[in-house]
Each structure stands twice: as C-alpha cells, then as structure tokens.
Design a protein with these regions (language model features):
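Glycine-rich acyl-CoA binding loop
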Residues: 1-11, 182-190
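A generic secondary-structure signal
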Residues: 6-10, 83, 131, 192-196
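Secondary-structure boundary elements
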Residues: 9-15, 147
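Conserved N-terminal entry element of GNAT/NAT acetyltransferase domains
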Residues: 73-104
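A conserved beta-strand-loop-helix scaffold within acyl/acetyltransferase catalytic domains
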Residues: 19, 23-25, 30, 41, ...
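Long, charge-rich alpha-helical interaction segments
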Residues: 55, 77-86, 111-115, 119
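Active-site/acyl-donor-binding loops of N-acyltransferases
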Residues: 17-79, 134, 157-183, 187-258
Length: 258
C-alpha cells in the first residue's frame, strides 16, 4: 500500500518516468495492482571468464588456500590473458582516463548525444555524480578521449564474489558514447577490461545490459540465467516511452542492484 501511495503521488505530477526491474515473484503485483506494463526487452547478464580456477575447484572438496593459490598460478586462461595483454596494444587515437570529477564536458556530451540513443535515465553530471562518485561503493569512472576530444565514459566496479571467498568479479556497470564509433569504442573498452582483469587477479568480467541496446557489448560474452524484466508505470510520461520504438539503452547503472 505504501508503494502504491508513493507511485500515485509521483504520477500526479506526470513528468516522472517510473520504472522497475521486478523479480518473478513481484512482477504480477506490478502488472495487476500497480498499473505497470511489461516492456518486451529486459536486461540480460553476460559473463566472460578470465580464469579457470573456479572450474577446477568444483572438483575439489574444501581446498586449502595454498591449493587455490597454486591453481591460480598455473591457470591456463589467466596465462593466456596475460600473453594477450602483452601482444594487444591500445590504439593511440584513444585514451581512457580515470576521473573523480564529473562536470560540464559530461553535460555537453549528454545534450549532443541523447537524441541519438534512447535511455531510461539521464546521463548528465548530476545523475553520474549521485550514482557513482557520491556512492559508498568504489566505482571507477573513466573518460573516453578520442582524437583529443571527450567522447563518452564508462564505469567499472570490482567486487568479491559472494558465493566464493577469495574470488573477484569486475562489473562493467555503465557506459555511454557516440554510436557512430560503437565498434571501435567497444573493442578498446574490452581491451581495458581484460587488462584490469589480468593485473587485478579478476576471475570474471560481468555485464548487465538491455537486450536490445544500440550500444550493446557482444564480444565473446556468455549469456547466463534469465533476463530481468523491465516494467514502466503507465502515467503520461510512461505511456510516451511505451509507445516509442525500440531499442533502448540501459545498464546496471539504471537498477537498484547496488
């Protein structure tokens, strides 16, 4: 009842888009009682293994720390990634610079590019500062500098695997860049992720993104599990979104996952 009341108050203003990513148990409540509509394309989860140690451990019961470290040292996928990182150089036309300041250049880029890509949330400096830099989690925000011009950003987060002690995942949380350079940017961002994985002893790179995103990252990642459904409240703004054509771009940064 409290949720229904809050949604009703926000909806009366008519200028708010209200959306959610319910689980299988709460989805019927959103649709039948809260006046939401299910969007055709939800959010998929994709994983790229950067080590095989976890696979080997499935065949061992209660391995010691020394055994785990030995497996890490001998891990063939880890060593292959290390060789790949040495042989693969970053393109000289592009730089990825970590920043703890999000300001006017992000706003200008957002104003220029948002008409080309449909997003659930804004990606201006106010949202990005609130979502990432003011968050207690240690998000890393990287500026994309292409031919000396600001050309977008991406955000990563390193987390311990909750189901496996001593294992770490690298999440690609958010990204937004010019669609005309999509293939090039995707290729170079993946190089950065692999280098981070190799240097930081990461076991998996994980991405969550909309199933129909125009900026979708598809290179050698394995889909896991079912997609998370997206629902939108059918107020005035929500109906405008529901009547628009796909595809939309949304990422883990648009959810309450963290």
């Amino acid at each position: 009842e409290a949720v229904m009341e809050s949604i009703h108050k926000i909806s009366e203003k008519n200028h708010h888009l209200i959306y959610g990513f319910p689980n299988q148990y709460s989805l019927p409540v959103y649709i039948k009682r809260l006046n939401f509509e299910l969007v055709k394309h939800g959010m998929k989860t994709q994983i790229k293994r950067t080590r095989l140690t976890g696979v080997f451990l499935n065949f061992l019961s209660n391995p010691s720390i020394k055994t785990i470290e030995l497996l890490r040292t001998l891990d063939p996928l880890k060593n292959l990634l290390k060789i790949e990182s040495i042989l693969t150089r970053q393109n000289k036309q592009i730089q990825f610079i970590r920043t703890k300041k999000i300001g006017d250049e992000f706003d200008e880029f957002w104003r220029n590019e948002r008409k080309n890509i449909k997003l659930l949330n804004v990606r201006d400096s106010k949202f990005l500062n609130w979502r990432y830099l003011l968050n207690k989690k240690d998000f890393e925000v990287y500026k994309i500098i292409h031919k000396k011009e600001f050309s977008g950003f991406f955000v990563i987060l390193e987390l311990n695997d909750p189901s496996r002690p001593n294992f770490k995942n690298l999440w690609l949380v958010d990204w937004f860049y010019s669609q005309k350079n999509k293939v090039f940017f995707e290729k170079e961002i993946l190089k950065v992720l692999k280098n981070h994985a190799q240097k930081r002893n990461i076991d998996n790179i994980i991405i969550q993104q909309s199933e129909s995103s125009p900026l979708g990252i598809k290179s050698n990642f394995k889909n896991v599990g079912k997609s998370r459904p997206l629902v939108i409240h059918k107020n005035e703004i929500g109906n405008k979104y529901l009547n628009q054509l796909y595809p939309w771009h949304f990422t883990l940064g648009d959810t309450d996952h963290f």
